């Protein structure tokens, strides 16, 4: 199953997340199919998600994680 979820990048105590499309069987930071945005939880908070690609992947059956659903509403 294809899922849209966050993968962590950044460094220790300075998280930065990429919004990616990946196979649900892959590890959190394993390979991904496509990167469709990013999320910076530190001040100033910053969210960018490509809505066109998000809608495409949802259209072909990708499921979103709970966190990505909440973030996509804010973006």
From Swiss-Prot:
UniProt keyword Zinc, yes or no: no
Keyword ATP-binding: no
Gene3D superfamilies in UniProt: 3.30.1320.10
Any GO BP: translation
GO MF assignments: structural constituent of ribosome
Domain of life per record: Bacteria
GO CC, any one term: small ribosomal subunit
Keywords: Ribonucleoprotein, Ribosomal protein
NCBIfam families listed in its UniProt record: S16 (TIGR00002)
Protein family according to the UniProt entry: Belongs to the bacterial ribosomal protein bS16 family.
Protein name per its UniProtKB record: Small ribosomal subunit protein bS16
Source organism per UniProt: Helicobacter pylori (strain G27)
Lineage: Bacteria, Pseudomonadati, Campylobacterota, Epsilonproteobacteria, Campylobacterales
Gene that specifies this protein: rpsP
